Amino acid sequence: MGSSCRIECIFFSEFHPTLGPKITYQVPEDFISRELFDTVQVYIITKPELQNKLITVTAMEKKLIGCPVCIEHKKYSRNALLFNLGFVCDAQAKTCALEPIVKKLAGYLTTLELESSFVSNEESKQKLVPIMTILLEELNASGRCTLPIDESNTIHLKVIEQRPDPPVAQEYDVPVFTKDKEDFFSSQWDLTTQQILPYIDGFRHVQKISAEADVELNLVRIAIQNLLYYGVVTLVSILQYSNVYCPTPKVQDLVDDKSLQEACLSYVTKQGHKRASLRDVFQLYCSLSPGTTVRDLIGRHPQQLQHVDERKLIQFGLMKNLIRRLQKYPVRVSREERSHPARLYTGCHSYDEICCKTGMSYHELDERLENDPNIIICWK
């Protein structure tokens, strides 16, 4: 499990009929101080309004996650059993991935109590200590855990890491597989995704995939969005030989990182050719600059490109942020014309987007804008 949500302590707290709220067990021992527990106990053993709800509270540089349980029955002292099995993490930890685990444990313990009085029986309750120890060790080590409770009950837990929302897939974006396409089994995806997978080649943009696969554009965008979420694809811009790129500071990683070198040279070498040299590839990346198109690069460096596929070179550079694209954004300096596509000339819409929305080619758009004295081109 990632260090960002490492569990520092697991505790079991309950309401004692004479002592009130207390920590019965904690692993490791004495991790939660008396002062800390006194500060947060109203959120550990709670009023009825907060019972059976997930609660996260931060105090004294620690974050405590719990789900207070209340089981009402006349067999219990004060007619109710109140307990909470929770986790303690660093106050800065991202604990969203742990919350379902805490909620699930509360449900399991409730079921065990209702079936066999597991929590209220002092003898069986002592089994919680080894269970909590296994929980702490295995969840921190691998993010998953199997807990044998008794002969008929086993608990299986797994931390599901929260993924950030992926970028929105626009019609002019180009999806590229992050690993070998053959590594993915199309049968595991929905029917729309299965239909578009053969058309994802790292060069077709979303709109073109939609047209060639005969799938409605919004459905393609949703499918690509799903593939982005799971890290199956990433997005790059449309590759044309008139494009302009420049290296980023990360291009230095190509010199320092051996695994990146290996991945790069394997990716950019022409099929059936002698392996490209790092020197040639690095020189090609560093030769990209404002004002230099891909076509210019090919004309100036035929020797270095002898074993290098220039399309794969650009593709890999974009995927690994070794280079970035400088795009053209038309800006209309007069406000006279608001017709389509003039309303796209605001400096906020790139050539890629305008061409996709209007159906014009780059050459047609270039000619139209070059002959318009009210248009200036912003590169960014």
UniProtKB/Swiss-Prot annotation:
Disruption phenotype: Embryonic lethality due to defective fetal liver hematopoiesis. Embryos also display reduced methionine levels. Lysosomal acidification is impaired, leading to defective lysosomal processing of cobalamin and methionine synthase. Conditional deletion in skeletal muscle causes constitutive activation of mTORC1 signaling: muscle fibers are significantly larger and show altered fiber-type composition, with more fast-twitch glycolytic and fewer slow-twitch oxidative fibers. Mice with a conditional deletion in muscle also have altered running behavior and enhanced glucose tolerance. The keyword Cell membrane does not apply. GO terms for molecular function: GTPase activator activity. InterPro entries: NPR2-like. One of its GO terms (cellular component) is GATOR1 complex. The modification Asymmetric dimethylarginine is found at residue 78. The record marks 124 as: Arginine finger. In the presence of abundant amino acids, ubiquitinated at Lys-158 and Lys-357 via 'Lys-6'-linked ubiquitination by the WDR24 component of the GATOR2 complex, thereby inhibiting the GATOR1 complex and promoting mTORC1 activation. Asymmetric dimethylation at Arg-78 by PRMT1 inhibits the GTPase activator activity of the GATOR1 complex and consequently inducing timely mTORC1 activation under methionine-sufficient conditions. GDP binds at residue 78. GO terms for biological process: cellular response to amino acid starvation; negative regulation of TORC1 signaling. Catalytic component of the GATOR1 complex, a multiprotein complex that functions as an inhibitor of the amino acid-sensing branch of the mTORC1 pathway. In response to amino acid depletion, the GATOR1 complex has GTPase activating protein (GAP) activity and strongly increases GTP hydrolysis by RagA/RRAGA (or RagB/RRAGB) within heterodimeric Rag complexes, thereby turning them into their inactive GDP-bound form, releasing mTORC1 from lysosomal surface and inhibiting mTORC1 signaling. In the presence of abundant amino acids, the GATOR1 complex is ubiquitinated and inhibited by GATOR2. Belongs to the NPR2 family. The arginine finger is critical for the GTPase-activating mechanism. This is GATOR1 complex protein NPRL2. It comes from Mus musculus (Mouse). The lineage of its organism: Eukaryota, Metazoa, Chordata, Craniata, Vertebrata. The gene is Nprl2.
